[in-house]
Amino acid sequence: MADGGSERADGRIVKMEVDYSPTVDQRLPECAKLAKEGRLQEVIETLLSLEKQTRTASDMVSTSRILVAVVKMCYEAKEWDLLNENIMLLSKRRSQLKQAVAKMVQQCCTYVEEITDLPIKLRLIDTLRMVTEGKIYVEIERARLTKTLATIKEQNGDVKEAASILQELQVETYGSMEKKERVEFILEQMRLCLAVKDYIRTQIISKKINTKFFQEENTEKLKLKYYNLMIQLDQHEGSYLSICKHYRAIYDTPCIQAESEKWQQALKSVVLYVILAPFDNEQSDLVHRISGDKKLEEIPKYKDLLKLFTTMELMRWSTLVEDYGMELRKGSLESPATDVFGSTEEGEKRWKDLKNRVVEHNIRIMAKYYTRITMKRMAQLLDLSVDESEAFLSNLVVNKTIFAKVDRLAGIINFQRPKDPNNLLNDWSQKLNSLMSLVNKTTHLIAKEEMIHNLQ
């Protein structure tokens, strides 16, 4: 603390009254020697007596040294019960100095890493988590211990318990923790939530990360981990447009751009997922922005596929499968396939969705160029049955992608949007004015011609 002040457990700031450094300098080597001779209990009693004096005098440095010495001697003697007992005792002493407890906990955290016996390690972690609970000044140490415990639980196959333990931490509120470490903790929470298929909690946790953080230096690994986790989350949600955006973020990462194979795979995924996304203004805008990427020249098949969806022409599904099916699903030596249309249940579902996007594209083209069309003719153009065509059409109308009215008895679809009466009247008035102006001009020209001919 500033000006030699120390903070007690009750929050009071106190100044050192007596400096016990010379006494501690003398006693600690003596105690260490006695501890090695097997007189540990006697040594601890001596140090606890000295600790009371230093604590009462608010000598933070000396108190810290004594607390660290006690746990160190217990650790070196492998007296695990005594170690846990003294950690609890020293942290709960009346008016204990916060900085001294923090030093002791930090020392014990190094022992957690060194201990190989699992039951002993778990007991020490539990003790340390107990003494650090609710104490802001050791919140970072508690977070690290909790992460270690979660890792052990996961390694033992108890992933659900690991996720539950790590979710206790609200690291986004830890002001003393570095931003990078906070993000690492949150990503680990996301990973474990996904592992136990807790997608709602994963979505909530993901919002704790501000993506602007990834613009900072040395954050590329964390950025890739974050977006890969988000892709897994949105795969479950079936949000293709979000997945496309995540792949774009991966594609724009310098370490991905540096390797041709990696950026090509990322760009292929960007193209495929933007095509798979249902049509709306945002999707349309993204398609045109992606189309402008010059690097698409290096993956021509994917560039041509994207162009099909921006060209105002009908597509035949059978032709698309013939031209692009092998490239998209199996790939080639020069251009490996992505996992988008892999031989999995999800891959098959996305392949079916691609066919749906082709049908929807074709219906939008018809709505653009036709005012009316029969159901049979539309089904013929779509290579579908009449019922399937009607189902697709209904879906697009419900989503307000197009406007259409179906006369079931006549079997005719009308794509022409009914005009507002006011607009209709305004159009009629404008056209009538235009016609009358034309008649007046024509009359004037005729009169002019007659006058010229009369003069002659």
UniProtKB/Swiss-Prot annotation:
It holds the Pfam family PCI. There is a cross-link at K92 (Glycyl lysine isopeptide (Lys-Gly) (interchain with G-Cter in SUMO1)). Residues 242-420 form the PCI domain. InterPro entries: PCI_dom, PSMD12-CSN4-like_N, PSMD12/CSN4, RPN5_C, WH-like_DNA-bd_sf, WH_DNA-bd_sf. The keyword Mitochondrion does not apply. The modification N6-acetyllysine is found at K221, K368. Disulfide bonds: none annotated. There is a cross-link at K92 (Glycyl lysine isopeptide (Lys-Gly) (interchain with G-Cter in SUMO2)). Keywords: Acetylation, Isopeptide bond, Proteasome, Ubl conjugation. GO terms for cellular component: cytoplasm; proteasome accessory complex; proteasome regulatory particle, lid subcomplex. The modification N-acetylalanine is found at A2. PANTHER family: 26S PROTEASOME NON-ATPASE REGULATORY SUBUNIT 12, 26S PROTEASOME NON-ATPASE REGULATORY SUBUNIT 12/COP9 SIGNALOSOME COMPLEX SUBUNIT 4. Belongs to the proteasome subunit p55 family. Component of the 26S proteasome, a multiprotein complex involved in the ATP-dependent degradation of ubiquitinated proteins. This complex plays a key role in the maintenance of protein homeostasis by removing misfolded or damaged proteins, which could impair cellular functions, and by removing proteins whose functions are no longer required. Therefore, the proteasome participates in numerous cellular processes, including cell cycle progression, apoptosis, or DNA damage repair. Component of the 19S proteasome regulatory particle complex. The 26S proteasome consists of a 20S core particle (CP) and two 19S regulatory subunits (RP). The regulatory particle is made of a lid composed of 9 subunits including PSMD12, a base containing 6 ATPases and few additional components. Interacts with ERCC6. This is 26S proteasome non-ATPase regulatory subunit 12. The gene is PSMD12.
